[in-house]
């Protein structure tokens, strides 16, 4: 896309705002390089990533990107065999830690909402835990290696501490015994060796090696001979320490080199995630949405807001183009918001085509344009010089030379800066030329000729910015279908210009112009009233919709509570009966034991009578659990798929979804529940034969429409399993032998959830992953019973 439009529409300022939300310098660099994409596939992918980032930020908070630094040069140094400094290794550690934490951040439970785009990115991350732990253990700060880096280093430093302690004890003794020869009763260090400050005149009184002297020459820093050997030992240990540190750093650098490819890949993915989340954070700040992207030149921006205008000052605008008209002519007074409208439309398109969410309402759409041209001056002046006219015309000529079949062109004061009649004629000619090439245009103007042109020309529409005559201020609302007027007479009257002067001015205007201006004013007033009525109606409708939704949800919750309470009561009753049966069996068992111990045949017969009486009583109690509230109805002897029946135990009508098995049980559907019951427990309904036949025909027709393939991509596991369960029931009743379930490859979570459900499903005979030409690992082939 041309750089001039990006500059004029202030896309660079948007990117500067976006950079504030990027953590790493590498992500900020991606922001600097951001330009509109050249195909809808890329645009939709980038918009979906931004939208997922926004949703994640709202649900889970900020991702763990802290500590990520640009390590490109560091990895190149390691790959060439160079030794990394502790500071460089800490930067590598920051990336490794961010890699591990980011992957943990994206882990979720099966029931949680999925974010496939970003989860796929995080899935590619390859944590290098061993290297992370080793650097963390070895490097203490940007300039210090830890004692724990190696056993050798630990031992060397322990010896150093011991030697230093011995030297300090000895030198303190020397200071005390030679205090009269010393400048101060203390010791110091010169060149890593312990020395004492001796007065120059007593140099011969303290035998030792001179290492330094004061600036005046009055003090000599002498290493006493008694310390030379100890100082030599300390120096040797310090050299060993340095050598061991170099070895540790070299070993760590080698391990970084060995893992350089994984580090580079992780760094690239983390940078991309940092960039994507910066877009999500900016969208959160703007209260932005993901627009639909069309490729037919039609767009509908609803409540669009300019992202660079302060929230409390920006006025939302509605702009449509490409459906009923291809050119929009905006007229109205200066400072009325015409130029802001142009810039808002252009900038929101550039943002969306660059993968950024836009500040607008959720039902907004943009269109894919290969080019967005903007001829917008930096200054809005009443007087325009010839040089300004020439500059605008030069830019227009460049625009007209381009193939504008997929272009959005924005003109500010088209034809301005020259004679009004010539300027208007030139503007009309330019519009017609560009329209004939398929371009979509929005232009602002003051010329009445262009208002009349828009009224009479097909595919061209007038628009104006609303102006409040009472306050003499623009409202900045865009009124499509209504041409604007300058309001010069009304403004002059409000300011205090005499009536006679205004009347005189009107006499110089033609009758046609006065009538035209009056017509425009009437249209504006009616449009304003209509807009207000529409806004009021929308508020009432939204309130009604919310109220309806609220009570529907409340009713649904009540139904669920009622069903659950009923089922809980039945389960509790069944448990009571079962416990009673168990207790009876225990009693009978005990009675048989007593019989073995000596009860005669007469007692045996009585025991059997009591046993039968107890069993009969329990069975009667169990039957009472399943009695209907009203008449039980006639017992069903035969059933058919799709037949309605009455189930007394639930006191409701159910639908038969399977034929009786070898145990005499059928599966029925009761609302959202599927349960197995005995055929003898079902009762005929009071439905007429005609209604039954009609129902069967409707059912058969419904099942005949069942397709042999269902696509679940984009759904979460819970929703997907629900749809598959219902789909398999329909497919089974539609006599489909084999069906295909498309779940995509992704992270494999959805496929696992589907497979777990298929293992338990009553209609599934067998299932397998798709083969070549069947969708591969992204699909599962299911054979039905």
From Swiss-Prot:
Its EC number is 3.1.-.-, 3.6.4.-. It holds the Pfam family MSSS. InterPro entries: DNA_mismatch_repair_MutS_C (IPR000432), DNA_mismatch_repair_MutS_core (IPR007696), DNA_mismatch_repair_MutS_sf (IPR036187), MSSS (IPR046893), MutS (IPR045076), MutS2 (IPR005747), P-loop_NTPase (IPR027417), Smr_dom (IPR002625). Keywords: ATP-binding, DNA-binding, Endonuclease, Hydrolase, Nuclease, Nucleotide-binding, RNA-binding, rRNA-binding. Residues 710-785 form the Smr domain. CDD domains: ABC_MutS2 (cd03280), ATP-synt_Fo_b (cd06503). One of its GO terms (molecular function) is rRNA binding. Gene3D superfamilies: 3.30.1370.110, P-loop containing nucleotide triphosphate hydrolases (3.40.50.300). The keyword DNA-binding applies. PANTHER family: OS10G0509000 PROTEIN, OS10G0509000 PROTEIN-RELATED. NCBIfam families: mutS2 (TIGR01069). Belongs to the DNA mismatch repair MutS family. MutS2 subfamily. This is Endonuclease MutS2. It comes from Clostridium botulinum (strain Alaska E43 / Type E3). The lineage of its organism: Bacteria, Bacillati, Bacillota, Clostridia, Eubacteriales.
């Amino acid at each position: 896309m041309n750089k001039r439009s990006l500059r004029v529409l202030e896309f660079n300022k948007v990117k500067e705002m976006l950079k504030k939300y990027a953590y790493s310098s590498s992500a900020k660099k991606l922001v600097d390089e951001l330009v509109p994409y050249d195909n809808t596939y890329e645009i939709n992918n980038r918009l979906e990533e931004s939208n997922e980032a926004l949703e994640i930020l709202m649900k889970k908070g900020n991702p763990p990107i802290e500590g990520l630094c640009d390590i490109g040069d560091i990895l190149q140094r390691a790959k060439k065999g160079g030794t990394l400094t502790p500071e460089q290794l800490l930067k590598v550690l920051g990336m490794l830690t961010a890699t591990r934490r980011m992957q943990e951040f994206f882990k979720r439970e099966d029931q949680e909402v999925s974010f496939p785009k970003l989860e796929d990115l995080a899935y590619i991350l390859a944590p290098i835990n061993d290297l992370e732990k080793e650097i963390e253990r070895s490097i203490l700060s940007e300039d210090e290696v830890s004692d724990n880096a190696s056993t050798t280093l630990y031992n060397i430093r322990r010896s150093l501490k011991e030697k230093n302690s011995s030297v300090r004890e000895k030198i303190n003794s020397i200071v005390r015994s030679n205090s009269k020869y010393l400048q101060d009763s203390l010791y110091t260090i010169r060149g890593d060796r312990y020395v004492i400050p001796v007065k120059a005149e007593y140099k011969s009184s303290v035998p030792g090696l001179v290492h330094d002297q004061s600036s005046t020459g009055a003090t000599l820093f002498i290493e006493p001979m008694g310390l030379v050997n100890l100082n030599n030992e300390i120096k040797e240990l310090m050299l060993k320490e340095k050598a061991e540190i170099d070895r540790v750093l070299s070993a760590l650098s080698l391990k970084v080199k060995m893992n350089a490819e994984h580090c580079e890949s992780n760094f690239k993915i983390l940078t991309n995630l940092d960039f994507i989340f910066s877009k999500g954070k900016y969208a959160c700040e703007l209260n932005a949405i993901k627009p639909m992207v069309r490729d037919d030149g039609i767009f509908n921006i609803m409540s669009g807001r300019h992202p660079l205008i302060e929230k409390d000052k920006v006025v939302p605008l509605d702009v449509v183009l490409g459906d009923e008209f291809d050119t929009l002519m905006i007229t109205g007074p200066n400072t009325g918001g015409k130029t802001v409208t142009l810039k808002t439309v252009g900038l929101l398109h550039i943002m969306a085509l660059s993968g950024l969410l836009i500040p607008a309402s959720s039902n907004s759409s943009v269109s894919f344009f290969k080019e967005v041209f903007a001829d917008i001056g930096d200054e809005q002046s009443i007087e325009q010089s010839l040089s300004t006219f020439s500059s605008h015309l030069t830019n227009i000529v460049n625009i007209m030379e381009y193939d504008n079949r997929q272009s959005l062109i924005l003109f500010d004061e088209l034809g301005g800066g020259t004679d009004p009649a010539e300027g208007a004629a030139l503007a009309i000619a330019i519009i017609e030329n560009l329209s004939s090439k398929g371009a979509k245009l929005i232009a602002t103007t003051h010329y009445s000729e262009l208002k009349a042109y828009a009224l009479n020309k097909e595919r061209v529409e007038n628009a104006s910015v609303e102006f409040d005559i009472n306050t003499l201020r623009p409202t900045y609302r865009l009124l499509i279908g209504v041409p604007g007027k300058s309001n010069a007479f009304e403004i002059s009257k409000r300011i205090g210009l005499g009536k006679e002067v205004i009347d005189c001015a009107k006499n110089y205007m033609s009758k046609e112009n006065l009538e035209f201006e009056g017509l425009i004013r009437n249209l504006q007033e009616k449009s304003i009233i209509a807009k207000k009525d529409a806004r009021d109606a929308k508020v009432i409708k939204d309130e009604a919709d919310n109220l309806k939704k609220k009570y529907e949800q409340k009713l649904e919750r009540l139904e669920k509570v009622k069903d659950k309470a009923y089922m809980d009561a039945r389960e509790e009753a069944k448990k009571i009966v079962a416990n009673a049966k168990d207790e009876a069996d225990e009693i009978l068992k005990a009675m048989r034991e007593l019989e073995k111990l000596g009860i005669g045949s007469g007692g045996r017969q009585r025991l059997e009578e009591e046993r039968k009486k107890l069993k009969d009583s329990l069975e009667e109690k169990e039957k009472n659990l399943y009695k209907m509230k009203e008449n039980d109805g006639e017992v069903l002897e035969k059933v058919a798929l799709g037949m309605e029946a009455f189930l007394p135990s639930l006191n409701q009508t159910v639908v038969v979804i399977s034929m009786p098995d070898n145990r005499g049980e059928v599966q029925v559907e009761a609302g959202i529940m599927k349960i197995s019951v005995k055929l003898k427990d079902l009762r005929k309904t009071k439905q007429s034969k005609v209604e039954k036949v009609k129902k069967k025909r409707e059912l058969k027709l419904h099942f005949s429409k069942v397709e042999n393939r269902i696509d679940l991509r984009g759904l979460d596991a819970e929703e997907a399993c629900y749809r598959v369960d219902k789909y398999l029931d329909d497919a089974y009743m539609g006599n489909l032998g084999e069906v295909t379930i498309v779940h995509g490859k992704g992270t494999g979570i959805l496929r696992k959830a589907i497979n777990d459900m298929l293992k338990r499903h009553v209609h599934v005979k067998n299932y397998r992953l798709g083969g070549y030409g069947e969708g591969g690992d992204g699909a599962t082939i299911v054979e039905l019973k």
